[in-house]
Amino acid sequence: MAIVSSARESLSHAMNNRFLPNLEYLLQGSILDSAVEHLMHRLKGLCDNVDTSPEPFHDLEVCMSLRQPNANQPLLLRVRRALGRDAPFQMRYLGNPEVDLRRPTLVRSCMDCACTNGILEFLTEMGFRLEFEYIAKGYMFRKGRMKITVSKLIKIVPGKQQDMANEPISQSYIVELSVVAPTGQENVGEEMRVFAEQLKPLVQLEKIDYKRLGGMP
């Protein structure tokens, strides 16, 4: 019981002092398939652990929505699971993006947690419905607290096994530069801007206003 109380006190202290990483700072871009190897080479030179290969990933991502009577937009939750390896499911809540002209990055509230493999059934029983799903396959790099992913998005073909889905959504890779940090660390955006400058002209990382585009990421 003492351990539980201590954990609760630590969590309460972290929340009261804004230590919890609850904001995602994000820049996004894309690069053609024909140029992605050049970007990978650049990232290997810029990022940590240059002597080792970047971390590969091959994940299924599912977006679930719950309609709320007094809200203009549904509640969206993302559930991601690794394909081909044993790992916990990951559930993520993303708030509406805030695009401030004074900030170099897009900012949105973010909460992540690990889940058991019954999370999709649980959400369905709560009233959530499937919005969309896709497979993301690529590589992840680290530079300090920054995370850089280079992903190929793959369409899930009805009637085929997930490992047989082989229809890319586009002839390009999605490139994302992100940091999840506590509230009040505005210097994060400047760090990301400086790093993004080093990837030009291979890829132009920008803050994308999804409200203007009429959709969510």
UniProtKB/Swiss-Prot annotation:
GO terms for molecular function: transcription coregulator activity. It is found in: Nucleus. It comes from the Eukaryota. One of its GO terms (cellular component) is nucleus. Transmembrane segments: none annotated. Pfam families: Med18. InterPro entries: Mediator_Med18. Keywords: Activator, Nucleus, Transcription, Transcription regulation. GO terms for biological process: positive regulation of transcription initiation by RNA polymerase II; regulation of transcription by RNA polymerase II. Belongs to the Mediator complex subunit 18 family. Component of the Mediator complex, a coactivator involved in the regulated transcription of nearly all RNA polymerase II-dependent genes. Mediator functions as a bridge to convey information from gene-specific regulatory proteins to the basal RNA polymerase II transcription machinery. Mediator is recruited to promoters by direct interactions with regulatory proteins and serves as a scaffold for the assembly of a functional preinitiation complex with RNA polymerase II and the general transcription factors. Component of the Mediator complex, which includes at least CDK8, MED4, MED6, MED11, MED14, MED17, MED18, MED20, MED21, MED22, MED27, MED28, MED30 and MED31. This is Mediator of RNA polymerase II transcription subunit 18. The lineage of its organism: Eukaryota, Metazoa, Ecdysozoa, Arthropoda, Hexapoda.
